[in-house]
């Protein structure tokens, strides 16, 4: 199976299935000398861990990470960093019934068509549990970005029809409520909404928003490797994501040029923007303003509602999906969005080191010898 490797210079290779022995990742390209511990990784993994509230799957997993290589005496060595998280509470018997049919909204059918075989126990590689590896690698990328003054804040912007009010935005609320919303009032409304959805044996979609500050101007490559194009690929690669926006996103289709353009001004000796409709990029290159991206997540497809599908014999049948499932994925997925943004940014930041000859000379302490 191709498609499990991401990045050029900061390169991650993920492996494992939801109901296998574990999931893991190998990170290649992390510079030597970064202070790194398992606890640095665990902080991020705890944010996506299941079983933390009534709005997540009741499957209980400690999701304890173990660093197998690439770290010595508390610092990265510059060699590949291998990490693993073992699975302990998988109940594959919950999925034996679905071996003979395709679950609506899942990748069962497409995996079967492509490979002629599928791991029906929780979806295999298409399971959300695959994102553990992304988060572990993203934790390292985020720590590297902090060395350059780049910070990432990700939270739940909307759950179903309930959206946060930026007038009540409080980043401290993100860790206080079960839905990772920076608005206590909206979080309370969203809980009521989710309770009604769950009583109807249904699930809800939602939206995550990610703000990246401290990104210097000049990150990203023109044409096919634009910063926003890479971010879009990274975010949409997350299993349940069906939409991506940067800046004003889809709203630009209804705007006029005088509304949409961000004016420039000199501020403290540098070029700054008067607004940020573009979301931090111009021409696929960072412009120094905060990156503002959003990801739309579909409702969890595993629901107790009766749904139409077909079995492997080609017969039409009706099914309802039993098992342990999230009624909404966004609160646990915000850290996955954060991880993929971090992986994209650190990779492009490293790539940008080769963009200018004068900067390469400066790095190596070489004087210019000829024009």
Can you name each region flagged by the protein language model?
Residues 11-14, 119-130, 217-221, 276-281, ...:
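A short glycine/serine-rich beta->alpha loop
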Residues 21, 201-316:
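Glycine-rich anion/phosphate-binding loop at the beta-strand->alpha-helix junction
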Residues 45-104, 108:
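Glycine-rich, N-terminal phosphate-binding loop and its surrounding beta-alpha-beta segment
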Residues 99-124, 307-325:
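Short acidic, glycine/tyrosine-flanked loop/strand segments centered on an H-E-D-like triad
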Residues 113-223:
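Glycine-rich, mobile lid/loop segments that gate access to catalytic sites or pores
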Residues 21-33, 129-150, 225, 229-233, ...:
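Alpha-helical support elements that line or immediately flank enzyme active sites
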């Amino acid at each position: 199976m191709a498609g499990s490797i991401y990045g050029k210079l900061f390169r991650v290779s993920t492996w494992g299935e939801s109901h296998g022995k574990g999931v893991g990742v190998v990170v290649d390209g992390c510079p030597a000398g970064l202070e790194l511990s398992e606890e640095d990784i665990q902080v991020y993994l705890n944010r996506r861990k299941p079983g933390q509230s009534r709005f997540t799957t009741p499957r209980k997993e400690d999701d304890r990470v173990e660093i197998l290589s690439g770290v010595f005496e508390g610092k990265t060595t510059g060699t590949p960093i291998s990490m693993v998280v073992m699975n302990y509470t998988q109940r594959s018997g919950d999925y034996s019934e679905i071996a003979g049919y395709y679950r609506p909204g899942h990748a069962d059918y497409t995996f079967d068509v492509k490979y002629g075989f599928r791991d029906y126990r929780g979806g295999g590689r298409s399971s959300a549990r695959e994102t553990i590896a992304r988060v572990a690698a993203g934790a390292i990328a985020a720590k590297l970005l902090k060395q350059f003054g780049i910070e990432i804040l990700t939270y739940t912007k909307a759950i179903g029809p309930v959206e946060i009010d930026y007038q009540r935005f409080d980043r401290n609320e993100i860790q206080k409520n079960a839905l990772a919303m920076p608005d206590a009032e909206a979080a309370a409304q969203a809980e009521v909404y989710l309770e009604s959805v769950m009583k109807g044996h249904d699930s809800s979609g939602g939206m995550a928003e990610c703000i990246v500050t401290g990104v210097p101007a000049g990150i990203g490559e023109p044409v096919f490797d634009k910063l926003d194009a890479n971010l879009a690929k990274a975010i949409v690669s997350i299993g349940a994501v069906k939409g991506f926006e940067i800046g004003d996103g889809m709203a630009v289709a209804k705007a006029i040029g005088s509304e949409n353009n961000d004016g420039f001004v000199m501020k403290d000796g540098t070029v700054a923007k008067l607004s940020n409709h573009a979301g931090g990029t111009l021409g696929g290159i960072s412009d120094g303003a905060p990156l503002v991206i959003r990801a739309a997540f579909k409702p969890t497809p595993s629901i107790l509602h009766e749904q139409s599908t077909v079995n492997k014999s080609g017969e039409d049948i009706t099914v309802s999906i039993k098992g342990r499932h999230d009624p909404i994925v966004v609160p646990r997925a915000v850290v996955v969005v954060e991880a993929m943004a971090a992986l994209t940014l650190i990779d492009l930041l490293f790539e940008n080191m080769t963009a200018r000859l004068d900067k390469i000379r400066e790095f190596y302490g070489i004087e210019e010898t000829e024009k």
